[in-house]
Swiss-Prot record:
Amino acids binding substrate: 10-12, 177, 216, 237-238
Subunit details: Homodimer.
Gene Ontology annotations for the cellular component aspect, listed alphabetically: cytosol
Isomerase keyword on record: yes
Subcellular compartments: Cytoplasm
CDD domains from the UniProt entry: TIM (cd00311)
GO terms, molecular function: triose-phosphate isomerase activity
Gene (name only): tpiA
GO biological process: gluconeogenesis; glyceraldehyde-3-phosphate biosynthetic process; glycerol catabolic process; glycolytic process
Domain of life: Bacteria
Protein name as annotated: Triosephosphate isomerase
Amino acid sequence: MTRQAIVAANWKMNGDSALVDTMVSGLADIELSSHVDVVICPSFPYLSELNQKIKAANLNEAIHVGSQNVSEHESGAYTGEVSTAMLQNLAINYVIVGHSERRSIFKETSTQVAKKVHAALNAGLTPILCIGESEAERATGETETVLSAQIQPVIDEIGIEKFKDVVIAYEPVWAIGTGKTASSAMAQETHQFIRKFLAQQNEQVADKVPLLYGGSVNAANCEELFAQTDIDGGLIGGASLKAEQFKIICSAAKGK
């Protein structure tokens, strides 16, 4: 079946107002089909600015703004956190949840990630759930076990039916920012496993979930990756900071 193709830019802790301007002007003439969503996720201080400039450039139908994180709590004494209501107030559509850097550096657990997915869905936001294994885990044949253990708590939290409103981004930890990329065949094999894992509980829902690949995706390898049956787009890191590269990657998703 035809699923929504998504190309999401994760700027991480990079960029400034100048990058916002460069990206909006660089994407001004982007041509996309209706089944491709482009999402740009800057750091929190630039969410509103990016949204306003996208609207001013009449790009708001083609490009959405997303957050790199969100709290699982509605409000309260959680210094430094940002709630779903705050993102709603800024007209944010997407939110990245459970990125490997959040899991490893900030010690977010799969249970906490599941609660963040739930909070995002309750607020009408589309969560981009990140999962992925380390190089050591792949070397010892644990990839499927690790991914299952990251997905199952979310199923337990929200139920499989609600996955029709969830995007999953598979990012092998060993490929993030390293220049290493899973081969297209390896990426497809893992994406196929993820879809089959979901299908064990609900095949119809599994067929609808967009699965993105992340991990050193660039203008040179995006077309081959996106040509794979179960890869519906990408979560892009370093290459998303360069407007010309990012435009090429977005255009490659048109073939999905």
